[in-house]
């Protein structure tokens, strides 16, 4: 029987917290003027690589998102060194940053469902109006 919550998942969870603190307190890059949230971290089994998924507060502007990811990639060495000081790991993983659009996509889907439910309620209240269309 395999472990359901192994070491890579535990390290990823702790790393997510530490990276969020580092981004909030230590990174002073003007390209990251918008609020950055670490939504998840995926670790490789050997703990040598980490995919860091981030979201931005003003993520409607695609150019700002690309600049934010680029700034994080360029600061990954600095973030990695601070991470090494904060966590006791034999190998500090190589960090790769990705934009996590699942939150935006989830909000879009929620809005679609809300609109469909509202439209359905309107049709139930006024059944004659829908037949005239």
Swiss-Prot record:
One Gene Ontology term from the biological process aspect of the record: maturation of SSU-rRNA
Lineage per the UniProt record: Bacteria, Pseudomonadati, Pseudomonadota, Gammaproteobacteria, Enterobacterales
Pfam entry (one): RBFA
Domain of life: Bacteria
Keyword Cytoplasm among record annotations: yes
Gene Ontology cellular component list: cytosol
An annotated Gene Ontology molecular function: ribosomal small subunit binding
HAMAP family linked to this entry: RbfA
Membership in a protein family: Belongs to the RbfA family.
Species this protein is from: Salmonella newport (strain SL254)
The protein's assembly and partners: Monomer. Binds 30S ribosomal subunits, but not 50S ribosomal subunits or 70S ribosomes.
Subcellular location as annotated: Cytoplasm
Protein name stated in the entry: Ribosome-binding factor A
Keywords, alphabetical: Cytoplasm, Ribosome biogenesis
NAD keyword on record: no
Described function: One of several proteins that assist in the late maturation steps of the functional core of the 30S ribosomal subunit. Associates with free 30S ribosomal subunits (but not with 30S subunits that are part of 70S ribosomes or polysomes). Required for efficient processing of 16S rRNA. May interact with the 5'-terminal helix region of 16S rRNA.
